[in-house]
């Protein structure tokens, strides 16, 4: 079937900000789809609120709107653009839910907009739990015994009929949001209440738990001619009961018999055909390990996290082909872009094993509930490719960047057997390491299988690794054993640890013995056809398939898995850097380990190495490719952390040199640099012991800001107000030592702003200055940033530009740099300098129209700023106002406190742009799903130090129609100062009128809660904040943010004035 000619303009809805359950995979799929549609000659209009994505670059679609993905704004854009069709299946759950809302509100019908890819009826049947149940019954596909409920009472009734355990699955939600497993009525009531609240259609499916079955996924494609194929099947290491996004996953499935595979494959193809999906679809199934009995768990009628994984695992570009199918092309007439000789109708074949491992945020959220269940908690993932399970698993392990290079974590030797077995039974994020430890202690596979329901096949593979550890320990420096363990994916570092020598010695010994990796191609066809894909993975085999060209090459290191503090912004910078390298006439090579991102799309670079970002793996690629140099600036802390070892190994690092990186990161050197340049900074000291820290704080005076050196995202950063808290921090939060000093700084309360700049060693370009709405004390990644600055005087701006120039030249920066300033009493202080790309780079690139990563890359390669058209120093400011606002995933992370502070907690960002600050703020809040009505009730429960400022804020909220509720201390202060309030209780104050109840009953429209440093662990305040998050009520833990929201509400209100 030829492509359709009756449609000309297509609108694509993106997935919005990155949250747990919906990460960079939609940037990858959305980018692919937009380019694929443009390739076919269609005009593409894109709507997405996330500025950190490649997808929202001007050249990806014909028209790009970075606007809130809400009914109000998408409808406005539809009315303005009048597209012929809408493609919602590439924007994750956000895109699907928006399509449903547009349809239900009659917008699509009114504007005569056709839905492409997956029809509304199919979305409804897959997402509406009742319709899905009916369809499965019609197809004779087994599903667990279940009931659709719209109230808690109905859920209890069903539970009384069939008993526990049960699983709650809310309709139309993402990543298992609001769902969970229940073993009793109390848990059922709690989870169903949250689930109904979070489901846009107030509906939950309550089903009999089949936890313990094998979880298998099939990624399937279908076109309008009813051609259908399986792209890839995948098997979860963890059984049903743990969200697939939180599970280790292998592709292809490892333990299925031919009969089982055929059974599940037929079911998946029957389902996609019955739903008449045109494009990609993910089917999740549960298989009884002891019979051929299976159940259909869920169907995602769209491109998903699993399809991004399947695309990267096979090389088959699902999103690109889904877009072509959506406009009428069929699988048997589209050429497979990898082989360039076969058609897309050929099912991919794999001659390797892929392992995906989730990356959890618990290194930042130590108080978080680590127990895994049906609600997703991972922020990102890594993928590794090997010739056997052991190899791919160990490569994935060391890709995670959690301080491990093997399936062993520190201090497990000291864990008692009781604790060990409890950790294995409980299924937390680190269970894999405890399983390996149990095998080291000779627990039987049968025992571990019965505790976990993990297939014995996988446990046996772990036992192979453990037995090889033992073999290594008993045969020190044995070359044959070395060869054997390298084949199974052991790292040089792990071997060195077992042999009690250093990593360099293992590396040299291995190289002398000729034990070197070769690189194999990912070609979709297990080498059956010729393929020209420049997509490689390492293994210890015979033939090397990565041929080195004569062209000079540059290696760019990516940023690894998405985690809090290092998100998709760094992938954005990596992709742009590669573009500039290619434009400069070099061969661009990317090395990265993240399957979700655009940078690991093989069409982006001249060569892609899908490998862990460790010294060993990077050096192996460098030894083979012999690049002109390596660019580290765009890979976040991941790449920067490799600088020292690469430099020592003689690798040419391009851009700012190691000694200058050190001068910015090393406290003493940095202080000396600032003093030499005559630039003020808050007084501070470095401490390597508890006593040193206490002495430093006494000299500076409390409060002080404490943090470890060399971290990203403010990890373990804290504001400390007294000696007791400081001693507690030094003994629990960090392990200070001469190698790992702790920085102690005076905490200045003032206005914070930051600058991204490009330096060529002689001149600098500052695309823009960003002013933070929240004052210092809230991490810059969690602050709302405004460009251009709205309240900075010309003198302050000139000072910032002057200090930036001095620092760029004084630190010999070549390429990108980010500087953070605090302004107190009209004096500018430098807080920190990062001589690399920062997370604000995509936002600033979008709003200034300067492709910063590209300019910086060309400068790194030797170009000068005078050869560009952007001039020097501060670039002229935009006449629009642009706001970058953080987005959080607290609903997914029970027990994580939503109070903002110096440690970063946001997972993503949105952007709001308009002609003035109030309108831009309105858009930013709407895009971040922080919506407040024009009137209602607002609760104030604030710290004593904030009461005076909070009073003024409460007065202005009252002036626009809000009723002020306050807890006792706040209410007494407000009443004494002439502001009438409604007194509310916190908790346990023998009063029905307490805040969590009021929030639950819909009586409260917003909560303003601030806490002094000495009361951070206040239990009542924690529960109030948690209640607001769970019920979706706007929560402000900074008065500055609450004031920004007031500006929005005020701008929407009319002035009501008594006649004089």
UniProtKB/Swiss-Prot annotation:
According to the UniProt record, where is the region Carboxyphosphate synthetic domain? 1-401
- Disulfide cysteine pairs (residue numbers): none
Q: Where does ATP 1 bind?
A: 129, 169, 175-176, 208, 210, 215, 241-243, 284, 298
Cellular component terms, GO, for this chain's entry? cytoplasm
Cross-referenced InterPro entries:
ATP-grasp, ATP_grasp_subdomain_1, CarbamoylP_synth_lsu, CarbamoylP_synth_lsu_oligo, CarbamoylP_synth_lsu_oligo_sf, CbamoylP_synth_lsu-like_ATP-bd, CbamoylP_synth_lsu_CPSase_dom, MGS-like_dom
Q: Where does Mg(2+) 2 bind?
A: 298, 300
Question: What does this protein's UniProt record list under function?
Answer: Large subunit of the glutamine-dependent carbamoyl phosphate synthetase (CPSase). CPSase catalyzes the formation of carbamoyl phosphate from the ammonia moiety of glutamine, carbonate, and phosphate donated by ATP, constituting the first step of 2 biosynthetic pathways, one leading to arginine and/or urea and the other to pyrimidine nucleotides.
Q: Which family does it belong to?
A: Belongs to the CarB family.
- Protein name as annotated: Carbamoyl phosphate synthase large chain
> What would be the name of the gene that encodes this protein?
carB
């Amino acid at each position: 079937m030829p492509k359709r000619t009756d449609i000309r303009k297509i609108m694509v809805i993106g997935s919005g900000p990155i949250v747990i359950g919906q990460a960079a995979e939609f940037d990858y799929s959305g980018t692919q789809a937009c380019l694929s549609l443009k390739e076919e000659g269609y005009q593409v209009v894109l709507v997405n609120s996330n500025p950190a994505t490649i997808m929202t670059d001007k050249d990806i679609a014909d028209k790009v709107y970075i606007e809130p993905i809400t009914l109000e704004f998408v409808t406005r854009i539809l009315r303005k653009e009048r597209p012929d069709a809408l493609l919602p299946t590439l924007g994750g759950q956000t895109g699907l839910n928006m399509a449903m809302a547009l349809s239900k509100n009659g917008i699509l019908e009114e504007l005569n907009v056709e839905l492409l890819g997956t029809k509304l009826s199919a979305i409804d049947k897959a997402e509406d739990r009742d319709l899905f149940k009916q369809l499965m019954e019609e197809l004779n596909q087994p599903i667990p015994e279940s009931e659709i409920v719209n109230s808690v009472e109905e859920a209890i009734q069903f539970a009384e009929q069939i008993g526990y355990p049960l699983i709650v699955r809310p309709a139309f939600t993402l990543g298992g949001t609001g769902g969970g497993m229940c073993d009793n009525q109390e848990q059922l009531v709690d989870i169903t209440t949250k689930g109904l609240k979070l489901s846009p259609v107030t509906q939950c499916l309550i089903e009999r738990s089949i936890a313990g079955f094998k979880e298998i996924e099939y990624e399937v494609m279908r076109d309008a001619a009813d051609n259908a194929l399986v792209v890839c099947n995948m098997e979860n290491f963890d059984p049903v009961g743990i969200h697939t996004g939180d599970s280790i996953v292998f592709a292809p499935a490892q333990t299925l018999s031919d009969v089982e595979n055929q059974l599940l494959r037929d079911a998946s193809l029957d389902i996609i055909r019955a739903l008449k999906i045109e494009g990609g679809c993910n089917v999740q199934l549960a298989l009884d390990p002891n019979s051929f009995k299976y159940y259909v768990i869920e169907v995602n009628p769209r491109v998903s996290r699993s399809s991004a994984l399947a695309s990267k695992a096979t090389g088959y570009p699902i999103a690109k082909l889904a877009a072509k199918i959506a406009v009428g092309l069929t699988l048997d007439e589209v050429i497979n872009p990898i082989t360039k000789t076969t058609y897309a109708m050929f099912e991919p074949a794999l001659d390797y094993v892929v392992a995906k491992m989730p990356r959890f945020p618990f290194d930042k959220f130590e108080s978080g509930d680590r127990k895994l269940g049906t609600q997703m908690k991972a922020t990102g993932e890594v993928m590794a490719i090997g010739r056997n399970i052991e190899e791919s698993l160990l490569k994935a392990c060391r890709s995670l960047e959690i301080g491990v290079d093997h399936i062993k974590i520190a201090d497990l030797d000291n864990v008692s057997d009781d604790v060990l077995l409890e950790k294995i039974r409980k299924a937390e994020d680190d269970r894999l390491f405890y399983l390996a430890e149990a095998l080291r202690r000779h627990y039987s596979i049968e025992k571990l299988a019965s505790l976990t329901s993990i297939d014995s096949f996988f446990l046996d593979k772990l036992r192979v690794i453990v037995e090889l550890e033992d073999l290594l320990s008993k045969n020190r420096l044995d070359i044959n054993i070395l060869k054997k363990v390298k084949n199974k994916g052991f790292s040089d570092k792990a071997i060195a640890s077992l042999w009690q020598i250093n990593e360099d010695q293992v590396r040299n010994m291995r190289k002398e013995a000729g034990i070197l990796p070769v690189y194999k191609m990912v070609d979709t066809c297990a080498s059956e056809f010729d393929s020209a894909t420049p997509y490689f993975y390492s293994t210890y085999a015979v033939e090397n398939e990565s041929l080195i060209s004569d062209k000079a090459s540059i290696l760019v290191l990516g940023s690894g898995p998405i985690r809090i503090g290092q998100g998709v912004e760094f992938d954005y910078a990596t992709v742009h850097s590669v573009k500039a390298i290619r434009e400069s006439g070099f061969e661009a090579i990317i090395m990265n380990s993240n399957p979700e991102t655009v940078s690991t799309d093989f069409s982006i670079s001249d060569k892609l190495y899908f490998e862990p970002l460790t010294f060993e793996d990077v050096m192996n690629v460098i030894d083979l490719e012999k690049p002109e140099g390596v660019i580290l600036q765009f890979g976040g802390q991941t790449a920067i952390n490799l600088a020292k070892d690469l430099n020592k190994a003689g690798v040419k690092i391009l851009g700012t040199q190691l000694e200058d990186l050190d001068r910015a990161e090393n406290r003493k050197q940095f202080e000396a640099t600032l003093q030499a340049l005559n630039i003020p900074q808050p007084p501070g000291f470095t401490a390597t012991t508890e006593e040193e820290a206490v002495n430093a704080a006494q000299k500076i005076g409390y409060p002080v800001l404490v943090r470890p050196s060399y971290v990203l995202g403010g990890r373990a950063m804290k504001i400390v107000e007294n000696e007791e808290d400081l001693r507690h921090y030094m003994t629990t939060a960090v392990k200070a030592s001469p190698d790992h000093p702790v920085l102690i700084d005076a905490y200045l309360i003032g206005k914070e702003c930051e600058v991204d700049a490009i330096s060529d060693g002689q001149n600098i370009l500052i695309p823009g200055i960003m002013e933070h709405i929240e004052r210092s004390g809230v991490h810059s990644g969690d602050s709302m940033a405004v460009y251009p600055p709205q309240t900075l005087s010309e003198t302050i701006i000139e000072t910032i530009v002057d200090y930036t120039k001095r620092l760029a030249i004084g630190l010999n920066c070549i390429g990108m740099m980010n500087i953070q300033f605090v302004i107190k009493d009209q004096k500018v202080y430098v807080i920190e300098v990062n001589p690399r790309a920062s997370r604000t780079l995509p936002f600033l690139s979008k709003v200034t129209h300067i492709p910063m990563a590209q300019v910086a890359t060309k400068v790194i390669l030797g170009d000068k700023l005078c050869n560009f058209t952007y001039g020097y120093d501060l670039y002229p400011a935009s006449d629009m106002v642009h706001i970058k606002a953080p987005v959080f995933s607290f609903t997914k992370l029970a027990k994580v406190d939503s109070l903002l502070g110096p440690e970063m907690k946001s997972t993503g960002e949105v952007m709001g742009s308009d002609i003035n600050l109030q309108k831009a703020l309105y858009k930013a809040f709407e895009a971040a799903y922080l919506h407040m009505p024009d009137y209602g009730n607002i609760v104030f429960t604030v710290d004593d130090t904030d009461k005076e400022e909070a009073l003024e804020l409460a007065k202005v909220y009252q002036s626009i129609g809000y009723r002020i509720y306050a807890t006792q201390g706040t209410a007494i202060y407000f009443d004494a100062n002439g502001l009438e309030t409604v007194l509310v209780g916190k908790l346990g104050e023998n009063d029905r009128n307490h805040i969590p109840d009021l929030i639950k009953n819909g009586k409260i429209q917003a909560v303003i809660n601030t806490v002094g440093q000495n009361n951070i662990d206040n239990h009542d305040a924690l529960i109030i904040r948690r209640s607001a998050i769970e019920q979706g009520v706007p929560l402000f833990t900074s008065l500055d943010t609450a004031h920004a929201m007031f500006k929005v509400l005020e701008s929407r209100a009319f002035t009501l004035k008594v006649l004089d």
